[in-house]
């Protein structure tokens, strides 16, 4: 966000809490999908960027978070090892939750990653509506195409509900309208 000269950009804490809040408000308590646990998803979102507090916010491709996650994993291993010291809470549960997010192998991890992506695209849309001249059209296409990287049905539903169908983001989609008209002429 700083590259686009956004004044007072979202902090890591604000991003984490916003993602957590999206999940709290919009995810169902139960789902027929085997292994689904809203609590585990919420825990994953609570710790998913914990290492960024130490290593800093990193610019990554949302569809290929592997490098960022690997770097964070090393930091978190050290942090959670401190839970083995006397008089320090055992953080093994949260390390296991983060490892689940890192590996992305179950429905909860995939849902948490989808929520993380949706929250980030939502933030882009908010910033675009405030600072439209800070973003080229290619940014709009790039951010909106992140929908293709979602992994869960609930992720697609929430993306549509919170972004695509959000009337407050009409400016984002309107910025692409002239291009669409040109494409129809060809």
Residue spans for each PLM region:
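Alpha-helical, largely C-terminal catalytic domains
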Residues: 1-186
């Amino acid at each position: 966000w700083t590259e686009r000269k956004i004044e007072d950009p979202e902090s890591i804490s604000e991003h984490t809490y916003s993602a957590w809040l999206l999940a709290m408000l919009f995810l169902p308590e139960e789902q027929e999908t085997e292994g689904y646990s809203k609590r585990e998803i919420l825990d994953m979102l609570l710790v998913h960027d914990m290492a960024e507090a130490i290593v800093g916010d990193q610019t990554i491709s949302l569809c290929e978070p592997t490098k960022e996650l690997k770097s964070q994993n090393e930091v978190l291993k050290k942090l959670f090892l401190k839970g083995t010291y006397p008089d320090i809470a055992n953080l093994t549960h949260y390390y296991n939750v983060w490892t689940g997010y890192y590996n992305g192998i179950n429905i909860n991890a995939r849902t948490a990653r989808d929520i993380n992506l949706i929250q980030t695209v939502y933030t882009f849309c908010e910033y675009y509506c405030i600072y439209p001249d800070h973003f080229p059209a290619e940014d709009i296409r790039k951010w909106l195409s992140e929908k293709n990287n979602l992994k869960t049905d609930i992720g697609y539903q929430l993306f549509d509900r919170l972004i695509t169908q959000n009337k407050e983001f009409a400016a984002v989609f309107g910025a692409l309208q002239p291009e669409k008209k040109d494409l129809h002429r060809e």
